[in-house]
From Swiss-Prot:
Matches recorded under CDD domains: IF2_eIF5B, IF2_mtIF2_II, mtIF2_IVc
PROSITE patterns documented for this protein: G_TR_2 (PS51722), IF2 (PS01176)
Keyword annotations from UniProtKB, A to Z: Cytoplasm, GTP-binding, Initiation factor, Nucleotide-binding, Protein biosynthesis
Region described as G1: 504-511
Region annotation (G3) ranges: 554-557
Annotated family: Belongs to the TRAFAC class translation factor GTPase superfamily. Classic translation factor GTPase family. IF-2 subfamily.
Lineage: Bacteria, Bacillati, Cyanobacteriota, Cyanophyceae, Gomontiellales
Organism, as annotated: Cyanothece sp. (strain PCC 7425 / ATCC 29141)
Domain (tr-type G) ranges: 495-668
Segments of this protein annotated with the region G4: 608-611
Compositional bias of kind Polar residues: 58-73, 146-157
Entry protein name: Translation initiation factor IF-2
Annotated region (G5), positions in chain: 644-646
Length: 1005
């Protein structure tokens, strides 16, 4: 107990009061306490001490030790067998009761205080009914304590053995009328029920008489006996039972009628008792019966709980709810309290309407039924109802799932387009994942639910399940998916310049041809002489005495830049296919043809390098016919123009053909609307931030427009054309560099101008979330291992990994490098790109590389200040490249370096056994070296008639009785082996040694 806390029982001991008296004072002062062991603050204790000085029944604190029995007053019922000795004790206070009859007459009806003194002892008898009396009378009590104190002091000496201190406190004036009725008949039965309190008087013989009327109502006796046994358990909570009626007191205080009636009835009864005390004992027995009946409901209520059938039912319920026993136990204890309150109400009504004993017995008969109904059963039933639906709901949910699984129809065919996990494959096949894993296990592949399966393995599993596997045709990325013109644009259409894309194989002269057209020297400034970006250029061409503009897009020809070529074909109006006359059709030429055909754009073939002596234009035309490109002179519809970019031959003819084709195509756009188009290229500039090259395909783009390109949102701050000049507006078919975006968009994304920034931001956030999910999926797939014989190594952690951080100049370069890296065999060494983005190499990239043991690759980009020093300090390797060939070669070499070198057998020479000599315990083979040489401690094989006889190590090699390190061809030598002695003439000896050899990446491994 802390210094500022006081316990109730310590306070009662200091005040020489009973615990119940202190609890009553606490209730009067509205101090919340639960029991005598509760703690209160010092301030509350001081309030209780002050109130205790005015508390009248406190003199009965001498009965404190008995009050503990009164707290066990419930156990007092076991004393019904011993009521007679206690009855004489209760007989003594009969004289006091006679005084009481006098006192009520003197103070009139309002002398509730005087009546309280006798009540203090007599109300103890109807303890069973105490709660009911306590509920209305306690409000009266605080007013009376002062006046009653003298009378109590007088009564205390008379009742030193009296035990019923709490009864005194709880007894109201209302109980006084019952008291006078009790003493003349010698209300020993009530003290017998409550255990003798401060009323000893009234002869013992009358007590059996009182019980005889109870015998008349067998229910009373039957119920009283069990009550005696049942009451001890609730005895402890009884102290707590008093508070609830007290809470109801304020409600009962409001109606004074019951109190006045009870007081008047008490007075009347008192008068009758005074007159009838000697004359009619029958009336006394009637009053006693009334008192007994009042207490009986409590006994009956408690006895109703005890029937065997109910106990058995409770036991069954407890067994069903074994897990919730602690909760139910507490509830069971509380419910009897509530029932007692209900019984008190019934008793109170019985006291107010004192009628025939038959009415009282009927009221006694009624409570047991509702009490039995209120017994622990409802609680248990309620809990079972609550718990039952839970378990039932779970069962139903499982059934529903099973039904859904059963009702889900299995498809007869499945479309597989790429790698996928076991879970995804199971969902597509409408099968449980366990079936997929089991099938793979039978095939010798141990897989988990998140294991990535390559297309071949997934197809094999699907076929094992009896399904047809369909592989969809890969849609060309060059196909035009969005129509830039809308219905409302049709009224304001105007002609626009054609967008021409130059495509072809690497080193066939695409950029040189464009330079010749533009009269610039772009090709000379390119690293390695190859184009690695898309360039957008504007050229003014004179045609029919008019200057017309043509927009040229130059695409890379290297195989790694497939996506760039496809992107160029998707946005173009006319494709110029450049083919070298001396080289013919090459792989990237074929790819460019497929892109142009997928985009459904007309193709103009420019046969370049006709100035070379080895040029064969006709052979080129013949090769192109295999791809449905038939020249016009051969009866086809494909325009083919032989040109020489170096000598500027036939360039005017080529431009004229381009303009003619553009006229046939009817190229129109609406410049009076907000701009729409495609991102050609994008990169992160160190000084200017994100920079995107945009091709406006419809509408007009102006400075200040709110632009959304993919998930990148921003406001156009500046636009720069291909010659480095700032422009304020970009009309259809115009390519410009745009500054002001918040992020680097992906090349190939479509852009659009919005009037409402909030709408644009919402769309940008949605697209960013989708990109984040796709990146997560790519990260998962980057860790995949093909389910081959090496999958075991992957699971055991033996699979080598090469971590890369890639930084390039533009988004298109990043895309091209990633695609090229994906073509490298990764069966034995897994290639993981941790981060790939356009921009310069920063210290953050170096820190990430140091944490993940990665190599930083920079392509056509620079190093930020401090990044090189940080890399040197942390030991991070930064590789810079400007040609994609070298980048890919070095990465392949690094991956091969991670492979464990393999041991390879290297042949040394051959020898033949010519003779066998016994030496000591063994034999020596005299041999002749036929080819190569024999080296001591090398590996040898002994072959006899082509069959292997022995394989081991050459332990001893001698030449003319001297040890030799090696013997070359054409010489004789002696060979001795420690573990082989079965030499025979004619045996062939093959000498070899095991050497380590660097492994190479094997795509079929």
């Amino acid at each position: 107990m802390s210094n500022n806390k006081v316990r109730i029982y310590d306070l009662s001991r200091d005040l020489n009061l009973d615990n119940r008296d202190v609890l009553i004072i606490c209730e009067q002062l509205n101090i919340p306490v639960k029991s005598h062991s509760s703690t209160i603050s010092e301030s509350e204790a001081d309030r209780i001490r002050a109130a205790a000085e005015k508390y009248v029944p406190s003199p009965s604190t001498h009965s404190m030790p008995p009050t503990r029995p009164t707290s066990h007053s419930r156990p007092l019922p076991p004393q019904p067998g011993k009521p007679q000795p206690k009855v004489p004790q209760t007989k003594v206070p009969q004289i006091l009761e006679l005084r009481r009859h006098q006192t009520p007459a003197e103070p009139a009806t309002g002398s509730a205080g005087s009546s309280v003194a006798p009540v203090s002892r007599s109300p103890v008898e109807p303890q069973a009914g105490l709660p009911k009396t306590a509920s209305p009378q306690r409000p009266v009590r605080p007013a009376a304590p002062g006046s009653n104190s003298p009378s109590h002091s007088e009564s205390t000496p008379v009742t030193p053995p009296a035990i019923s201190k709490p009864a005194v406190s709880s007894s109201p004036a209302r109980t006084e009328p019952l008291r006078p009725a009790v003493p003349p008949p010698k209300a020993a039965p009530s003290p017998a029920a409550m255990a003798g309190r401060a009323e000893p008087s009234q002869p013992g013989p009358q007590k059996p008489v009182l019980k005889r009327p109870k015998v008349e109502s067998p229910q009373a006796e039957v119920e009283s006996a069990p009550v005696a046994t049942a009451t001890p358990a609730p005895a402890s909570p009884r102290a707590e039972l008093t508070p609830p009626p007290r809470r109801e007191l304020p409600q009962l205080k409001a109606p004074p009628r019951p109190r006045s009636e009870t007081s008047e009835d008490g007075a009347r009864r008192g008068e009758k008792l005074v007159a009838r005390a000697p004359e009619p004992p029958g009336t006394e027995t009637d009053a006693i019966e009334v008192l007994q009946n009042v207490s009986l409901p409590k006994l009956a209520g408690r006895g109703a709980k005890r029937p065997k059938t109910k106990a058995e039912e409770e036991d069954e319920l407890q067994e069903e709810l074994a897990a919730k026993t602690p909760k139910t136990a507490t509830k069971l204890k509380r419910r009897p309290q509530l029932k007692l309150e209900d019984e008190d109400d019934v008793d109170f009504a019985a006291e107010v309407n004192v009628q025939a004993v038959v009415d009282v017995s009927q009221s006694l008969v009624r409570p047991p039924k509702p009490k039995a109904a209120k017994s622990a059963k409802p609680a248990a039933v309620a809990t079972t109802r609550i718990s039952a639906p839970k378990t039932g709901g779970r069962k139903l949910s499982r059934r529903d799932r099973r039904q859904q699984e059963e009702t889900q129809e299995r498809p007869t065919s499945v479309v597989l387009s790429g790698d996928l996990t076991v879970q995804e494959l199971a969902n597509r096949l409408a099968l449980p994942t366990s079936e997929i894993i089991k099938t793979l296990f039978f095939k010798g592949i141990a897989a988990t639910i998140n294991q990535m399966l390559d297309l071949e393995t997934a197809s094999m599993v699907a076929r094992e399940m009896g399904m047809e596997v369909e592989t969809p045709e890969v849609e060309s990325t060059a196909r035009k998916v969005t129509e830039m013109l809308e219905a409302q644009d049709l009224e304001n259409l105007q002609r626009r310049p054609p967008v021409v894309t130059i495509m072809g194989h690497v080193d066939h002269g695409k950029t040189t041809l464009l330079d010749a057209i533009r009269q610039t020297k772009v090709a000379q400034g390119e690293a390695g002489g190859i184009t690695q970006h898309i360039g957008a250029y504007h050229v003014d061409v004179e045609h029919e005495d008019q200057v017309q503009q043509v927009v040229f897009l130059d695409t890379p020809g290297h195989e790694a830049f497939t996506a760039m070529r496809a992107r160029g074909a998707r946005v173009t109006d006319i494709a110029i296919l450049v083919v070298a006359a001396d080289d013919g059709v090459r792989p990237q030429t074929v790819e460019a043809i497929s892109h142009a055909q997928a985009a459904e754009v007309p193709i103009v073939v420019a046969i370049n390098k006709i100035d070379k002596p080895t040029a064969q234009p006709d052979r080129v035309k013949q090769e192109l016919t295999e791809y449905n490109l038939v020249p016009e002179e051969w009866g086809g519809d494909t325009i083919m123009v032989p040109v020489s970019a170096i000598n500027r031959e036939n360039l005017d003819t080529l431009l004229e053909m381009i303009l003619l084709v553009s006229e046939v195509e009817d190229l129109y756009a609406n410049p009076d609307r907000s701009a729409r188009g495609t991102v050609i290229e994008a990169h992160l500039d160190k000084a200017r931030g994100p920079v995107a090259t945009l091709l406006v395909q419809n509408g007009t783009l102006r400075v200040g427009d709110i632009l959304l390109a993919g998930s990148a949102l921003g406001k156009v701050r500046a636009m720069i054309d291909d010659r480095g000049q700032r422009v304020e507006a970009a009309t259809p078919s115009f390519a410009v560099e745009v500054l002001g975006l918040g992020d680097v968009p992906a090349a190939g994304d479509e852009f659009e101008v919005f009037n409402d920034e909030r709408e644009a931001r919402a769309i940008a956030n949605e697209r960013a979330n989708q990109q984040r999910l796709s990146r997560l999926q790519q990260a998962l797939s980057s860790r995949r291992v093909s389910l081959t014989s090496l999958s075991d190594q992957a699971r055991e952690g033996e699979l080598k990994e090469l971590n890369l951080i890639l930084k390039a100049d533009v988004q298109g370069s990043v895309e091209a490098i990633l695609n090229a890296l994906g073509q490298i065999p990764q069966n034995e060494v897994q290639l993981r790109v941790l981060y790939a983005a356009p921009g310069e190499v920063t210290e953050t990239d170096v820190d990430l590389a140091a944490a993940s043991n990665a190599v930083v690759i920079g392509f056509n980009t620079t190093l930020a200040s401090g990044s090189r020093a940080s890399a040197d300090q942390t030991g991070v390797d930064i590789r810079e490249y400007n040609i994609i060939y070298k980048l890919l070669d070095d990465i392949e070499g690094a991956m091969e370096g991670l492979l464990e070198p393999e041991l390879v057998e290297e042949p040394l020479g051959q020898a033949q056994v010519r003779a066998v000599f016994p030496v000591g315990k063994g034999f020596v083979a005299g041999c002749y070296v036929q080819s190569g040489k024999l080296i001591r401690n090398c590996k040898i094989r002994v072959l006899r008639s082509g069959n292997l006889v022995h394989s081991g190590t050459l332990n001893s090699l001698k030449r003319i009785k001297e040890d030799a390190r090696e013997v070359n061809a054409g010489y004789e030598c002696g060979i001795r082996l420690d573990d082989f002695q079965g030499w025979a003439e004619g045996d062939q000896i093959e000498a070899y040694q095991m050497v380590t050899k660097r492994r190479t990446l094997n795509p079929n491994a």
